[in-house]
Amino acid sequence: MSKMAEEKVLAAPATVDGGMQSSGDLQASSAAAARVRPVETLLRAAPLGLCVAAMAIMLRNSVTNEYGTVSYSDLGGFKYLVYANGLCAAYSLASAFYIAVPRPATLSRSWVVFLLDQVFTYLILAAGAASAELLYLAYNGDKEVTWSEACGVFGGFCRQARTSVAITFASVACYILLSLISSYRLFSAYDPPQPSLGNKGVEIAAFPR
């Protein structure tokens, strides 16, 4: 190998097998993560208050009148909403503390945060969607199965449930943003796919006239 070729090899940036970035790129990513850490910590703490508020409103949602008594515990979708908000509140607190403490950026930690963000995002989204469907039936009924609307009789119950569901969807928005942040942090640690080294052109057969 010539001297010039050796210099080119030494000057080329080292990459990790599997398409990961070099150590210098990882250090740059760590510096960028340190700059956005306070913002991400606040964003992770925000769902804590939202989830607790949605859970507390739904837990107190019970109405009694001359037509009877209705409580959130009578409906499986609303019970799921309470459980999901409780779990997401605990995760928000834990993840906010985890992000607030400076740690070396590693690929395994990025994968863990990414996967947990995905799990809890879909968990709270499913709870909000199921509860929204219950609210729709409570307000409009379902003529095909002869279900009458119930909010005309239990209006206070429906209003509290609607408030809890609206707050839950605000938490969903926060978790979607967190999922985008964690996915960007994870996949930016990998190099983009390299173009194929095969033939770039397409040969077209020429037929004689």
Swiss-Prot record:
Question: Which key words are in the record?
Answer: Cell membrane, Membrane, Transmembrane, Transmembrane helix
Q: Which residues lie on this side of the membrane: Extracellular?
A: 60-80, 131-163
Predominantly, its location class is membrane
Q: Where does the chain cross the membrane?
A: 39-59, 81-101, 110-130, 164-184
Task: Look up the domain of life of the source.
Answer: Eukaryota
Q: Does the keyword Transmembrane apply?
A: yes
Q: Cytoplasmic face: residue ranges?
A: 1-38, 102-109, 185-209
Q: Which InterPro entries match?
A: CASP/CASPL, CASP_dom
Choose one Gene Ontology CC annotation of this protein and give it: plasma membrane
Report membrane topology: Multi-pass membrane protein
NCBIfam families in the record: A_tha_TIGR01569
The protein in question is named CASP-like protein 2A1
Q: What species is given as this protein's source?
A: Oryza sativa subsp. indica
